[in-house]
Regions:
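Conserved beta-strand signature within the Rossmann-like core of class I S-adenosyl-L-methionine
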Residues: 150-159
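A short SAM/SAH-binding and catalytic strip from SAM-dependent methyltransferases
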Residues: 120-134
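S-adenosyl-L-methionine
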Residues: 85-119, 128
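Short beta-strand element of Class I
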Residues: 80-83
Length: 293
């Protein structure tokens, strides 16, 4: 299928289809875990920060190890305060104003950070991997941190249960389709509304069927409207197109470079080329905990 523009947010008009197993199906998409973390975090920070006020923000990242994405992220947001938490070690050298805590994030840490940065705007990102049996417990834990910290905006991994007609209560926001994810994964990310503790219900069945359509149709389609032609780096797939769009928003909205200008084209080519080379040469495609497709 050929489509002009990509879809980033799961909405009421998103395509849906019944989930089915695809174990023997030949996949045409690529799973790049650390590249996904980087690109999706760039999207979150670009949409959440006013560049001229960047010293007013603190970025708290729970689940930051081993740090391949964070090391590159520091280059893109050099003036932003980073606070990283993970019981596993951060194996990369992280420059800039960065605190690293090799331990689990807890309510006590949330209270400490809330007191220390009560005049700042806290951006919280959580990559917490947990079994489906403890899914609701995980959501409750994140809701609690969000409330204690008085989070300005949060980005949270969301994997709602399969084959369920139930729903889950969680923070109000927009569910974003993944980039460079597993071929049949159901995980996406929720980016909350600004300065909210409002809770809404998310339908398990709607989420399952929207993600099934995304994996089988949206992500495997060809996207015809790509303004930046870089055939040695990108093709016209969903992931390449989404990455280009997210980086374009970063260049225009965060770096304040005029869209379509010579400076824009130069910066985009440099950035896209460098990111592609970085993930090819400096980090594994899959994390060590990943067992198989």
């Amino acid at each position: 299928m050929h489509i002009e523009r990509i879809e980033r947010i799961i909405g009421s008009d998103s395509g849906q289809m019944a989930y089915f197993k695809r174990d023997r199906e030949r996949h045409t998409v690529i799973f790049q875990y650390y590249r996904r973390e980087l690109i999706e975090t760039v999207e979150f920070l670009t949409q959440s920060i006013i560049p001229s006020e960047i010293n007013q923000y603190v970025f708290v990242f729970v689940g930051a190890a081993p740090g391949y994405d964070v090391a590159y992220l520091r280059q893109l947001f050099p003036a932003l305060k980073f606070i990283l938490f993970d019981p596993k070690p951060i194996s990369q050298d992280i420059d800039g104003d960065t605190e690293i805590h090799q331990e689990l994030f807890t309510d006590d840490f949330a209270r400490q950070l809330s007191a220390r940065y009560k005049k700042k705007k806290i951006l919280l990102q959580c990559y917490t991997r947990i079994s489906s049996k403890r899914f609701e417990e995980n959501l409750s834990m994140i809701r609690n941190w969000h409330s204690i910290l008085g989070v300005h905006r949060g980005a949270y991994e969301m994997t709602l249960p399969y084959d369920s007609d139930g729903s889950s209560l969680f923070l109000k926001g927009a569910l974003y389709f993944p980039v460079w994810s597993k071929p049949a994964g159901a995980d996406c990310r929720l980016i909350t509304d600004f300065d909210t503790n409002k809770l809404v219900r998310y339908s398990h069945r709607y989420h399952e069927e929207a993600m099934a359509y995304f994996n089988c149709v949206t992500r495997t389609s060809i996207y015809t409207k790509n303004e930046l032609h870089l055939p040695s780096i990108y093709d016209a797939c969903y992931d390449c197109t989404a990455e280009r769009q997210i980086l374009s928003e970063y260049v225009c909205d965060f770096l304040c470079v005029k869209h379509g200008s010579d400076a824009y084209k130069k910066k985009m080519k440099e950035l896209c080329t460098d990111i592609s080379a970085y993930f090819k040469d400096n980090c594994p495609q899959l994390p060590d905990w990943f067992v198989g497709w």
